[in-house]
């Protein structure tokens, strides 16, 4: 990563500037227009802070199948956090950084998990980026302040190490309690996304252990119903067991600092549903199961 010199952001009185320039032009002369600066904002990242960013604190990669709309959403979300600088003592909000997941911002309709099922929704796939960032933050020794698991385990990260988000409802956030600022850098390619968290060598952990301490099964149930319009008995909803998972984060630094955190995930079981075409068929099945 290379850095170039920063420049302040200036907001001018546009109406006054145009009026002054119009006056000069209407007179058929040349001259200088008076410019009133309404607002000035200094760069978020100073040259001094940029020079302190000299090492990768932690990074993580997740992979995904090629799907045009979902890929596009992942790309947009990854780009939206690229270049974010979080000063010491400040916090990062994923929802704030990525903004509204809307068509106006380029997001497309793609599958999202709702109550354990895939349903179409604008911005499907952004959770892959928040999950990737969560794991990079864990490995960097950062303090996670907001994180929630999905309704069901996902396939692109170990169980208990996912981070779902929902605009205005569920956020992923971390607090920078390190000595120096951290800089987020994302690398998107079709089929994978990598997030690097860069910082100062003084803040690079000397030891990181992310372990799964518990992975208990929560059995699902099988329910039945009758639908006379069906031509055959069949399993209409494929359920799965739930999980209760505990993941711990243990971090050490060379100067003696330590950090420990625990993350609890409860994935609800989803019932299996078998639909019979008649009550007698259901009873026959139940009798067979008992024998």
Model-identified regions with their sequence ranges:
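Well-ordered beta-sheet/strand-loop patches within structured domains
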Residues: 1-291
């Amino acid at each position: 990563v290379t850095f170039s010199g920063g420049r302040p952001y200036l907001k001018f009185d546009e109406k006054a500037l145009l009026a002054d320039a119009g006056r000069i032009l209407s007179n058929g002369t040349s001259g200088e227009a008076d410019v009133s600066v309404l607002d000035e904002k200094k760069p978020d990242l100073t040259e001094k802070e940029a020079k302190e960013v000299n090492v990768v604190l932690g990074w993580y990669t997740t992979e995904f199948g090629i799907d045009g709309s979902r890929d596009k959403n992942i790309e947009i979300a990854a780009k939206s956090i690229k270049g974010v600088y979080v000063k010491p003592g400040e916090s990062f909000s994923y929802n704030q950084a990525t903004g509204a997941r809307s068509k106006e911002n380029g997001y497309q309709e793609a599958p999202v998990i709702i109550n354990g099922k895939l349903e179409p929704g604008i911005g499907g796939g952004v959770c892959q980026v928040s999950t990737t960032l969560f794991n990079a933050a864990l490995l960097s020794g950062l303090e996670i302040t907001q994180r929630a698991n999905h309704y069901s385990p996902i396939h692109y990260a170990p169980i208990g190490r996912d981070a779902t988000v929902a605009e205005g409802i569920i956020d992923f956030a971390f607090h920078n309690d390190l000595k120096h600022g951290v800089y987020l850098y994302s690398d998107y390619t079709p089929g994978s996304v990598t997030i690097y968290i860069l910082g100062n060598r003084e803040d690079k952990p000397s030891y990181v252990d992310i372990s799964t301490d518990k992975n208990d099964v929560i059995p699902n149930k099988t329910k039945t119903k009758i639908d006379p319009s069906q031509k055959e008995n069949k399993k209409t909803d494929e359920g799965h067991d739930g999980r209760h998972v505990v993941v711990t984060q243990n971090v050490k630094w060379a100067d003696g600092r330590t950090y420990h955190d625990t993350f609890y995930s409860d994935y609800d079981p989803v019932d299996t549903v078998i639909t019979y075409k008649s009550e007698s068929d259901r009873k026959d099945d139940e009798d067979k199961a008992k024998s």
